[in-house]
Amino acid sequence: MKITRQKHAKKHLGFFRNNFGVREPYQILLDGTFCQAALRGRIQLRDQLPRYLMGETQLCTTRCVLKELETLGKELYGAKLIAQKCQVRNCPHFKSPVSGSECLLSMVDEGNPHHYFVATQDQNLSVKVKRTPGIPLMFIIQNTIVLDKPSPRTVAFVKAVEAGQLVSVHEKQSIKQLKEEQGLVRNPDLRRRRRKKKKVGGPNPLSCLKKKKKAQDTKSPASEKKRKRKRIRNRSTLKVSSEQQGAEG
């Protein structure tokens, strides 16, 4: 049973890898229901998931999932501990948390650009995930981890792309670049370039003024010394002339 289960997982992974760019490390988004099922089945996720998927994995969750487990109380305390050990991915609900299922759906929205796996026991969430092509779905059944086969919507999408009826991933990227060039989509790289251009400038006029003031200050004491020396010489000549006049008299 274990060998056939791994064969199915290898086949499904190959499908998602070839058609949707899924690659290692496999990023698996866990919700509270999956953590609770792993706790009841005594499944060591960090050990068993890499063996089952035959590759490096990263266990991930979101702040909304952690907040949901925290509000549910002591009954899901063990599941909360499992989720807290996962890497927390940033979600758009930092100020106003939503339910765990809604949050995970938002993480795989717009074509699942980060190639997340969704691991859940929630049937409603599973149905919604299957409606979006290209999202690997995982669940636990009879204390064993299972990677679900590609959904009918996913298979139909791949066939339509191969037949030329839908836009492929590469074409979507080129369309996005054109929109960025026309200013329809904000490009973070352009922002960085603009910021760099603003930083480049001429010398600060205030610094130039300070330098001139310093130069004037250095000249002023020298001129005062010269004037003092001239006065001293005049006084000495007057003394000599007075002494000569006294001697003649």
UniProtKB/Swiss-Prot annotation:
Pfam family, one: Fcf1
PTM sites of type Phosphoserine: 174
Cited InterPro entries: Fcf1/Utp23, PIN-like_dom_sf
Residue stretches of biased makeup (Polar residues): 237-249
Cross-link Glycyl lysine isopeptide (Lys-Gly) (interchain with G-Cter in SUMO2) residue location(s): 179
Biased composition (Basic residues): 191-200, 225-236
Keyword Coiled coil recorded: no
Alphabetized CDD domains for the sequence: PIN_Fcf1-Utp23-H
Chain segments carrying region Disordered: 180-249
GO biological process, alphabetically ordered: endonucleolytic cleavage in 5'-ETS of tricistronic rRNA transcript (SSU-rRNA, 5.8S rRNA, LSU-rRNA)
Compartments where found: Nucleus, Nucleolus
Keyword Kinase in annotation: no
Sorted UniProt keywords: Isopeptide bond, Nucleus, Phosphoprotein, Ribosome biogenesis, rRNA processing, Ubl conjugation
GO molecular function terms attached to this record: mRNA 3'-UTR binding; mRNA 5'-UTR binding
Main location: nucleus
Gene3D superfamilies: 5'-nuclease (3.40.50.1010)
UniProt GO cellular component terms: nucleolus; small-subunit processome
Family of the protein in this entry: Belongs to the UTP23/FCF1 family. UTP23 subfamily.
Chain's role: Involved in rRNA-processing and ribosome biogenesis.
Protein name: rRNA-processing protein UTP23 homolog
Species for this entry: Mus musculus
Gene from which this protein is expressed: Utp23
